């Protein structure tokens, strides 16, 4: 086997799907007023984390993004860090 093939095979073996945090918490619909839940999906620079990092489904990621944007508009979450 070539070196690249060995490296690729190792990476495929070590890759695991992330646990879905919303499913684990039993949350079906994301609410913009639930700040503690939304903070899990925001980085330290207050950017919305990607699906790859959070382990959400595409539909849940859209719900989280909309909820974070609504919470920012309602001044429940800051737009940026200081």
UniProtKB/Swiss-Prot annotation:
GO biological process, one term: translation
GO cellular component terms given for this protein: cytosolic small ribosomal subunit
Keywords attached to this entry: Ribonucleoprotein, Ribosomal protein, RNA-binding, rRNA-binding
A single MF term (Gene Ontology): small ribosomal subunit rRNA binding
Annotated spans, Disordered: 1-23
Pfam family, one: Ribosomal_S18
Family from the record: Belongs to the bacterial ribosomal protein bS18 family.
Function: Binds as a heterodimer with protein bS6 to the central domain of the 16S rRNA, where it helps stabilize the platform of the 30S subunit.
Subunit architecture: Part of the 30S ribosomal subunit. Forms a tight heterodimer with protein bS6.
Stated name of the protein: Small ribosomal subunit protein bS18
Organism per entry: Corynebacterium diphtheriae (strain ATCC 700971 / NCTC 13129 / Biotype gravis)
């Amino acid at each position: 086997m070539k070196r690249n093939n060995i490296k690729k095979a190792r990476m495929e073996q070590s890759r695991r799907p992330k646990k879905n945090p919303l499913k684990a918490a039993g949350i079906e619909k994301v609410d913009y007023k639930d700040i503690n839940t939304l903070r899990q999906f925001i980085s330290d620079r207050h950017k919305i984390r990607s699906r790859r990092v959070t382990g959400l489904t595409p539909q849940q990621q859209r719900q989280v993004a909309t909820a974070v944007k609504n919470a920012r508009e309602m001044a429940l979450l800051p737009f940026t860090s200081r």
